[in-house]
Curated annotation (Swiss-Prot):
CDD domains: PIN_LabA. One of its GO terms (molecular function) is RNA nuclease activity. One of its GO terms (biological process) is circadian rhythm. Keywords: Biological rhythms. This is Low amplitude and bright protein LabA. Disruption phenotype: Cells grow slowly on solid but not liquid medium, excess KaiC expression no longer autorepresses, decreases the amplitude of circadian rhythms. Partially restores sasA deletion phenotypes suggesting they are not in the same output pathway, does not restore rpaA deletion, suggesting rpaA is downstream of labA in the same output pathway. In double labA-cikA deletions KaiC levels are much higher than either deletion alone, but the phosphorylation ratios are nearly wild-type. Signal peptide: none annotated. Induction: Transcripts rise slowly in low continuous light with little rhythmicity. The keyword Membrane does not apply. Functions in an output pathway of the circadian clock. One of three clock output pathways. Involved in negative feedback regulation of KaiC; deletion leads to overexpression of KaiC protein and decreases the amplitude of the circadian response. Overexpression reduces the expression of circadian genes.
């Protein structure tokens, strides 16, 4: 029987990860993320998606163009402003891209055997349960204090960003790819 690599799709909830990275005090490099998860002979990367909210159509243009040049499919939505009177009349902005992430997961489910989801949002719990029922292996990447318990419990494997920091952290100078260690399931 011929060897067939496991087909991988990566889904990055950019807004959720922005806050996780701020909490950690460091940022990951999108190129190094691809290398870490897909640069192994037993893995075939079939797609990588990045989802982010925008203040205006030109917001993050350079970053989005760089993501596309790395091979990411970039999905965007305009930020909406909300007023929270219960919190001292504070205004906040939000672009909820959860439904876009789930739609892409299910529209492409026949293309992959496993996914890596960068998010801590508990809204993904049911989608993850349904994908696991289809024999899809799910890894969720987030950080302690930013991941919903129900999401962490629904996944096959959880990786804390800080555990893979040395492999994915954004640095001032490009570094050669270093083979990633195998991280045992939590």
């Amino acid at each position: 029987m011929a060897f067939r690599p496991s087909r991988l799709a990566i889904f990055i909830d950019g807004n959720n990860m922005f806050y996780a990275q701020q909490k950690n005090g460091w940022f990951f490099d999108p190129r190094r993320v691809l290398n870490y998860f897909a640069n192994r002979p037993e893995i075939e990367l079939v797609n990588a998606y990045w989802y982010t909210g925008l203040k205006d159509p030109q917001d993050q243009r350079g970053f989005r163009d760089a993501l596309v040049s790395l091979g990411y499919t970039v999905r965007t939505k305009m930020l909406k402003e909300f007023h929270d009177e219960s919190n001292g009349n504070r205004y906040f902005q939000r672009a909820n891209l959860d439904i876009e992430i789930v739609i892409d997961m299910f529209n492409t489910v026949e293309q992959y055997d496993e996914i890596v989801l960068f998010s801590g949002d508990g809204d993904f719990e049911r989608a993850i349960e349904l994908l696991r029922a289809k024999q899809t292996h799910i890894t969720v990447v987030s950080t302690d204090g930013m991941i919903a318990r129900e999401l962490r419990n629904a996944t096959d494997r959880y990786i804390d960003l800080n555990d893979i920091r040395s492999f994915i952290e954004k640095t001032e100078r490009p570094e050669p790819f270093v083979s990633a260690p195998v991280i045992a399931p939590a």
